[in-house]
From Swiss-Prot:
This is N-methyl-L-tryptophan oxidase. It catalyses: N(alpha)-methyl-L-tryptophan + O2 + H2O = L-tryptophan + formaldehyde + H2O2. It is an enzyme of class 1 (oxidoreductase). It comes from the Bacteria. The keyword Plastid does not apply. It comes from Shigella boydii serotype 18 (strain CDC 3083-94 / BS512). Keywords: FAD, Flavoprotein, Oxidoreductase.
Length: 372
């Protein structure tokens, strides 16, 4: 059988692509080296932020707004356990923060619902938070967080119900291109398609070693908290920048545990076995202490944590482009630790590519040619 589309990597973007392409009537094969959702990539740990006034650059705002529409649609499949939780997101940092300046600019350009608070206003609204006098907060009322593993599980189930073929626990070992399309090699045999999407995450270079993607080991952890830090008490998800530039992110507490991670830093790795479990690097359990001591002093000890990986591009912007020399193969990689919120729209973009539809978005900033 020759498929219309083969998806290599069915984590966040791949799961979405499988669903949207199958829903569009294509004959699709989803593949993954493991059984998604799983613990081997970048999507585990239950939750991911979604921010609209994007501090990483205005070019992302049209994408994230479409992503939000698609997340809302997906959430309707799980109304008893919603995939998107509109908790709000408070972005904290020094008044001269470049990141917060980008957030404010994005909000102004796209007329987003963002409220600016000074230090006293932040602490009055959320007494659990402590910030210096020179800090500001930009509160995104309509943002929140996503249930990452639930989202992937839902997409995969919906795709399967729509007739999508799924080949999991089966690594793709090679990709070949010829006049007839794309062939993938797996331990289970060879499969052909007219087009392919490569969204293999951290280890995409195992298949395409020429790509400028660097795996980085990262950790996040859950710390002892109480009901003051919960959604029920209107405690928001958050990003926070320390005076030294370190960037943190976190979520409202659930079951008396608050999840937090550090966005920058981490350990450069070159193989999967170098991504050692949480606590095998001495700094893992204490990485968030500088932020917690200064900004959330009421949070208690580290309860447990997990390791994941970022697939970093050189400039930490996404790579969305066809494979050089092969216009029938789309790459979506280099998501650099801020990609999950876009998984829905990136999956839709992949499905459009498979249907020979022109994208509704300007993807020029994400081309590989910027690294030449």
């Amino acid at each position: 059988m020759k498929y219309d589309l083969i998806i290599i990597g069915s984590g966040s973007v791949g799961a979405a692509a499988g669903y949207y392409a199958t829903r569009a009537g294509l004959n699709v094969l989803m593949t993954d080296a493991h059984m998604p959702p799983h613990q081997h990539g970048s999507h585990h740990g239950d939750t991911r932020l979604i921010r609209h006034a994007y501090g990483e650059g205005e070019k992302y705002v049209p994408l994230v707004l479409r992503a939000q529409t698609l997340w809302d649609e997906l959430s309707r499949h799980n109304e008893d356990d919603p995939i998107f939780v509109r908790s709000g997101v408070i972005n904290l940092g020094p008044a001269d923060s470049a990141f917060l300046a980008n957030v404010a600019h994005s909000a102004e350009q796209w007329q987003l619902n963002v409220e600016k608070l000074d230090a006293q206003g932040i602490m009055a609204r959320w007494p659990e938070i402590r910030v210096p006098d020179n800090y500001i907060g930009l509160f995104e009322t309509d943002s929140g967080f996503l249930r990452s593993e639930l989202a992937i599980k839902t997409w995969i189930q919906l795709a399967k119900e729509a007739g999508c073929a799924q080949l999991f626990n089966c690594p793709v070992t090679a990709i070949r291109h010829d006049d007839d399309g794309v062939t993938i090699e797996t331990v289970d045999g060879e499969y052909q398609a007219k087009k392919a999407i490569v969204c293999a995450g951290t280890w995409v270079k195992d298949l395409l070693p020429e790509l400028p993607v660097q795996p980085v080991r990262k950790v996040f952890a859950w710390y002892q908290a109480d009901g003051r830090y919960s959604v029920k008490n209107k405690f928001p998800a958050f990003t926070g920048e320390l005076p030294n530039g370190d960037q943190y992110y976190g979520f409202p507490a659930e079951n008396d545990a608050l999840k937090i991670g550090k966005h920058n830093g981490g350990q450069v790795i070159h193989s999967a076995d170098e991504r050692v479990p949480f606590a095998e690097v001495v700094s893992d359990g204490s990485e968030a202490f500088p932020f917690l001591r200064n900004v959330l002093p009421g949070i208690g000890c580290c309860l447990y944590g997990a390791a994941c990986t970022y697939d970093n591009s050189p400039d930490e912007d996404f790579i969305i482009d066809t494979l050089p020399g092969h216009d029938n193969t789309l790459l979506i990689t280099g998501l650099s630790g801020h990609g999950f919120k876009f998984a829905s729209v990136l999956g839709e973009i992949a499905a459009d590519f498979a249907q020979d539809k022109k994208s509704d978005f300007d993807l020029t900033p994400f081309r590989l040619s910027r690294f030449q």
